[in-house]
Amino acid sequence: PTGATGATGTGVTGATGPTGPTGPTGPTGATGATGAAGNSVECSCVQQMRNILRQIIQLYPQDNVIVAMESGNNASGRPGSLLPAPNTNPNAGLFQLTNNQGVPQEAISICRIASIRISSAIYNNDITYLPAPTPSDTGCGADCQNAIRSYLPVGTTSAAINAGGQTVAQGTVLRSEYGMLVLVGPNNSSPTFVSTCKAEILTK
């Protein structure tokens, strides 16, 4: 008769077999967080306008200013303050006018200002401007802004700028800064600060 089966022995492990074929691609993962926004020439124009308004409040507190909007509307009064307060707020978005008694009047969106003219004053050479951003703004808006400044360089006489269906500035180009042109009358009178992002029709 056959005897009992003996204990199973463990042999030496054989060599590793070849790698199998690559499996199917897994599903696409979740979209990552949105990166930081690139430079916008529109923001640069607003920053330059805010910078100038802050200085107008300091240098021309008793003078009347005329603010032309991109829509064609106008507002006038004395320069009051930037809002939200204080005037040094780097994120201020409104410019508030006052009447002759210093009582606050309408608040104006800085993002919609085409120009601001100081009708009864002389240009103050102490006014300073923000430099062009680094890295430079890109895109269609930057192309238009650069073309406007190129078309109306400093010293251009009999220049006129139209926005919102009205002439918002005319005279001689005194300054050409990033996001802004300054036009003046005889002897640097009645300076007008124009956003190059809002200028529409240019003549010279």
Name each region found by the language model.
Residues 30-78, 82-170, 174-204:
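Short glycine-rich, low-complexity segments
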Residues 1-44:
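Collagen/collagen-like triple-helix sequence repeat recognition
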